[in-house]
Amino acid sequence: MSTFTRLIAATSSTFPRQCLTGGVLFATGDTIAQQLVEKRGSRHDLARTFRLSLYGGCVFSPLASIWFGRVLERVRFSSKAANIATKVALDQAIASPAFVALFFGATTIMEGGSPDQAKNKIIHNWWPTLKTAWGLWIPVQTLNMALVPPSQRLLFVNVVSIFWNTFLSIKSAAASDHAVKPNLNDAVELVETKLDKLH
């Protein structure tokens, strides 16, 4: 096990640590987006990274911890296949749509936007982002429910979320940062196209 994986595993066993891990991983995703995709270099938007870290630690992780640890674990069938199929279906029919909307709404408000601006951002970005989410998370969550012990499922999601958080950061910036919007749209379209081919 790599040092990075051991670090995440060590910080994913309790609720406060899960929140800390979520904050770190959202910050990591945004840093990758800004430095490797947007090529910002010294123009790195620290406030944006802080906002996403705050969202990951204080909004997403607490809700995800409850969802995986308390809600989905109540689903029990005698058949393992039925268990997996039901949990993945519930996760993608309920949690994914809600979390996508929550991300765009919460981050817009955290940027200083109005409720109307948050609503508009959700309307324009929710469905394209949700389709991309399904392309990634349906296979990921199937593996998660089938192979990963319940206590480590949020850890597994967090590791994959580094890449997903990078995409969300780019997608959010493309909808609000006009200075770099053309390049960001190219990156968003590339990811969406690749994941659409998995359907």
Curated annotation (Swiss-Prot):
Similarity field: Belongs to the peroxisomal membrane protein PXMP2/4 family.
Keywords: Membrane, Mitochondrion, Mitochondrion inner membrane, Transmembrane, Transmembrane helix
Bilayer topology term: Multi-pass membrane protein
Source organism, top-level taxon: Eukaryota
GO cellular component, one term: mitochondrial inner membrane
Record localization: Mitochondrion inner membrane
UniProt protein name: Protein SYM1
UniProt main location, coarse: mitochondrion
Keyword Ubl conjugation recorded: no
Task of the protein: May be involved in cellular response to stress. Required to maintain mitochondrial DNA (mtDNA) integrity and stability.
Gene designation per UniProt: SYM1
Biological process, per Gene Ontology: ethanol metabolic process
Transmembrane segments: 52-72, 93-113, 130-150, 154-174
InterPro entries noted in UniProt: Mpv17_PMP22
